[in-house]
Curated annotation (Swiss-Prot):
Any one Gene Ontology cellular component term annotated for this protein: chromosome
Intracellular or extracellular location(s): Nucleus
Start and end residues of each stretch annotated as Interaction with DNA: 426-427, 490-495, 581-583
Protein name: DNA topoisomerase 1
Organism of provenance: Daucus carota
Swiss-Prot/TrEMBL catalytic activity: ATP-independent breakage of single-stranded DNA, followed by passage and rejoining
């Protein structure tokens, strides 16, 4: 049949238009790509699929969120296109809009993005009809262990025992994963990936990228959030002007929060004490007998707290287990799992509401703190759940959730306004070990790896050429980019008056940077979490001259970069590389530093031939260099001095034992009995006259015994020397790392594949580097080949 030429032309034109449109959309997405700080999980993972051109995952029509205009159910609310991310923290974190407010992998959305004008706010009725509950045969129940799952699950108790730095995991299968075609290794190497509990990661990645309604048409199911138990008064009275004072439970709770910190350095800081009293006075009331903090004596409460701590230390394992079971572990198990796509059972990362540490942190850092309000006294929690899933019952009978959403464009399960800072929000997300989070984390490090293809061009042309630019704005952008690249500074954001006075690169004040000729810059400011950043660095002469110009004619409290903010800087960075932000720089510099250090000849020589403990020390020193670059500090613990004393005592004790063993060896070599028996008791001198008849037998026995004893003593000497060397090494490492926090960079900035590959190359069990939580978080990295380079 002959085709119509007109129709052919129309089809060809339509094809060209579609191809051009898809190309523009792809370019638009590339230009708008941002770091983990700025884009939601739904955008990063499924934007391609939603736009119809993803070759990774195909999504059916049933992935779209139900329209509020067509649904017969009044409580259905169409979710906004929120810019919300999956949190990497296991604790509930405020979603601050500033870059340095969190060290997690993601930030939180603005308040204006949370509401959709087209949404109708319908609260859940106080009593839900029974017939609204789904049939057990159709819906997966989180409280039942038989809920569908695509992997073997551990109990809550096993999952939560992940805090040790060096957990022993022995029940792992041994199976080499190193490709023979890529690496030939005669020596059998331990399989790092085999030391992780079996997680079918390849299958987990098939979980649909939207949460509310999955590929199979099954909804997201979870049980909401859990509240901490109400405060139980202990009844211990504090003193005011040496007289006992009666306090209400609420007053006592805040007083106890303060009292338990009596022996910390914060008690010497006037601002901390002022913030506490400002908060406490609001609860005490104007007419309360307590009027000033100087006359307060919290010692009785502190001593009570210390006694309680000591009691817990003295408890047996069974007693501790009984107490733990008394905290309603079954109830906790109910909240710690969510079912995604009706088949994948994922752990929820942060399902508890409220902590005392939030309040204590506000006293440390905030300009205008306030004691935490009870979120659940006025239910202020919004739940996001599948359309057909059963709505979780509010924890308080008779109450209702603030709002029920069925939003498939976001990844949070619940959120509420931060009770301390109402401008910020707290979210409940899936755990860091979930398959969705694993995919996001992997993509974060892949983005940072791409920077190595751009970095030389960025340094040579993108900012170096603008150091002496006549355009002041260009010059400020160039210098700020240089500082972010070379010093791994955070970008920084503007703060409200009631927020902590912390700064980043873009918010540096004139007083934060001093110039010392010929080209030294001295930095001194409070960074994230109010950690002080102090550093003297030598910079390029043109950078030094530019900083002097930026400081000229300004007061100490004026902005150093007065023509620059974070949004302008990030917009410029995205022009240099798609998705480039200050955090990508920071992640790149941290990972590339570790990669180069563990590959350098010096560390390779130190690692060769050593035992596992020596190799771990080599890795820790490389990790330390990264932590210093990122300014990951910690205060010296109160117990540090006591630990060093105990180590010294043990070393001296071992040296005494070594001396005795060496004396024994000398006596054995001379044919004499040792000074002590094998049981450590003094050896009795032989009376030869008394045992004259048995002398010959004794001599024969002594000769045979001497050889055995010589070998035994020699072995003990070697073992004792090894113990002394290990303790000396532990002592040196503990002293060297006392002010450095290694964990933060390991969790957020170091590509785990670098560490896993290093462990494989040097026969180091991965458990020696990653604790149980990190093993679960980085399950996706365990199959990396040992020749991996960042």
């Amino acid at each position: 049949m002959k085709s119509n030429p007109g129709i052919t032309v129309i089809k060809q034109n339509a094809s060209n238009v579609m191809e051009k449109t898809l190309k523009e959309e792809g370019q638009s997405r590339s230009n708008s790509e941002d770091s983990d700080d700025d884009k939601p999980l739904s955008h990063k993972l499924s934007s391609g699929a939603l736009n119809g051109n993803s070759h990774h995952i195909r999504m059916g029509s049933n992935l779209s969120c139900p329209s509020p205009y067509t649904s017969p159910k009044p409580r259905i609310i169409k979710g906004p296109e929120d810019e919300m991310l999956l949190s990497s923290e296991l604790q509930l974190n405020a979603g601050a809009s500033n870059a340095e407010s969190s060290d997690s992998d993601e930030s939180k959305p603005l308040a204006s993005e949370l509401e959709d004008p087209s949404s109708s706010l319908n609260k859940r009725p106080l009593i839900q009809p029974k017939n609204s509950d789904p049939s057990p045969s159709k819906k997966a129940k989180l409280s039942e262990p038989s809920a569908p799952t695509n992997r073997k699950l551990k109990t809550a108790e096993q999952e939560e025992a992940a805090a040790d730095d060096d957990p022993s995991i022995s029940n792992r299968n041994k199976k080499s994963t190193t490709p023979a075609s890529k690496v030939s290794d005669k020596k059998k190497r331990p399989d790092v990936s085999a030391s992780v509990n079996k997680v079918d990661f390849s299958k987990s990645l098939k979980v649909p990228l939207v949460l509310v309604k999955g590929r199979n048409g099954q909804p997201l199911v979870h049980n909401g959030v859990i509240f901490p138990p109400l405060y139980k008064p202990h009844g211990v009275k504090m003193l005011y002007r040496e007289n006992p004072v009666d306090l209400t439970p609420e007053q006592e709770e805040v007083a106890t929060m303060f009292a338990v910190m009596l022996e910390t350095e914060y008690m010497t800081k006037p601002k901390f004490r002022e913030n506490f009293m400002s908060d406490w006075r609001k609860i005490l009331g104007e007419k309360h007998i307590i009027q000033n903090l100087e006359d307060c004596d919290f010692t009785p409460i502190y001593e009570w707290h210390q006694r309680e701590k000591e009691k817990k230390k003295q408890m047996s394992t069974d007693e501790k287990k009984a107490i733990k079971e008394g905290k309603d572990e079954t109830r906790k198990e109910k909240y710690m799992w969510a079912v995604v796509d009706g088949m994948s059972r994922e752990k929820v990362g942060n399902f508890r509401v409220g902590t005392t540490r939030v309040v204590q942190r506000s006293w440390r850092a905030s300009k205008d703190p306030q004691v935490k309000k009870n979120v659940y006294s006025q239910i202020d929690i919004t739940i996001n759940i599948g359309k057909d899933a059963p709505i979780p019952e509010p924890p308080i009978p008779g109450e209702r959730w603030k709002e029920i959403r069925h939003d498939n464009t976001v990844t949070w399960l619940a959120f509420w306004n931060d009770p301390i800072n109402p401008k910020e929000f707290k979210y409940v997300f899936l755990a860091a070990s979930s398959s969705l989070k694993g995919k996001v984390t992997r993509e974060k490090y892949e983005k940072s790896r791409k920077l190595k293809d751009y970095i030389e061009g960025i340094r040579a042309a993108a900012y170096t050429k603008d150091f002496a630019s006549k355009d002041s704005k260009k010059r400020q952008i160039a210098v700020a980019t240089y500082l972010i690249d070379k010093l791994a500074l955070r970008a920084g954001n503007e703060k409200d008056d009631d927020e902590a006075d912390t700064v980043g690169c873009c918010t540096l004040k004139v007083e934060n940077v001093e110039t010392k000729r010929p080209n030294i810059l001295k930095f001194d400011f409070l960074g994230k979490d109010s950690i002080r950043y102090q550093n003297e660095v030598e910079v390029e002469p043109r950078v030094f001259s530019a900083i002097e110009q930026f400081r000229s004619g300004k007061e100490g409290g004026d902005d150093l970069f007065d023509q620059l903010d974070t949004s302008k800087l990030n917009a410029h960075l995205k022009e240099l590389m798609p998705g480039l932000t200050a955090k990508v720089f920071r992640t790149y510099n941290a990972s590339i530093t570790l990669d180069e250090m563990v590959r350098c000849k010096l560390l390779s020589r130190e690692t060769k031939g050593g035992d596992v403990a020596e190799k771990v020390v080599v890795y820790q020193h490389a990790n330390k260099e990264v932590a210093i670059i990122c300014n990951h500090q910690r205060t010296v613990s109160k117990s540090h001095s006591a630990q060093m004393v105990r180590l010294n005592e043990k070393i001296e004790e071992l040296k005494g034992l070594l001396k005795e063993l060496q004396e024994d060896l000398t006596r054995v070599n001379k044919g004499k009995p040792p000074l002590k028996n094998s049981d450590g008791k003094p050896k009795r001198n032989l009376n030869l006259k008394r045992y004259k008849g048995k002398l010959l037998k004794l001599i024969q026995k002594l000769r045979k015994w001497s050889e055995t004893r010589r070998l035994s003593v020699t072995k003990k000497i070697a073992q004792t020397n090894t113990k002394i060397e290990k303790m000396e090494r532990d002592k040196e490492t503990k002293e060297d790392l006392k002010t450095v926090a290694l964990g933060t960079s390991k969790i957020n900035y170091l590509d785990p594949r670098i560490t896993v590959a290093w462990c494989k190359r040097h026969d180091v069990p991965i458990e020696k580097i990653f604790n149980k939580s990190l093993l679960a978080k980085f399950a996706w990295a365990m199959d990396v080949v040992l020749i991996f380079r960042f």
